Amino acid sequence: MGIKPSYIKNFGLELIGRYGDRFTPDFDENKHQVSELTVIDSKRVRNRIAGFITRKVNTKKHL
């Protein structure tokens, strides 16, 4: 999807820093976690943050 905006990255990294153990390599599960942990009205922004977190978790797993 291209380069993510900085607010998506910053918010995603903050969530990973605070609640890193709650996120999994599964996008749908992360989507529900982001909904639980935040108050984001926009489905598109929520999905972008969940996608960023999923990508980070999957990358971390391969290292």
From Swiss-Prot:
Family, per entry: Belongs to the eukaryotic ribosomal protein eS17 family.
Pfam (any one): Ribosomal_S17e
Organism: Methanosphaerula palustris (strain ATCC BAA-1556 / DSM 19958 / E1-9c)
Classification via InterPro entries: Ribosomal_eS17 (IPR001210), Ribosomal_eS17_CS (IPR018273), Ribosomal_eS17_sf (IPR036401)
Keyword Transmembrane helix: no
Any one GO MF annotation of this record: structural constituent of ribosome
Alphabetized UniProt keyword annotations: Ribonucleoprotein, Ribosomal protein
Superkingdom of origin: Archaea
GO CC entries: cytosol; ribonucleoprotein complex; ribosome
Gene behind the chain: rps17e
Protein name as it appears in the record: Small ribosomal subunit protein eS17
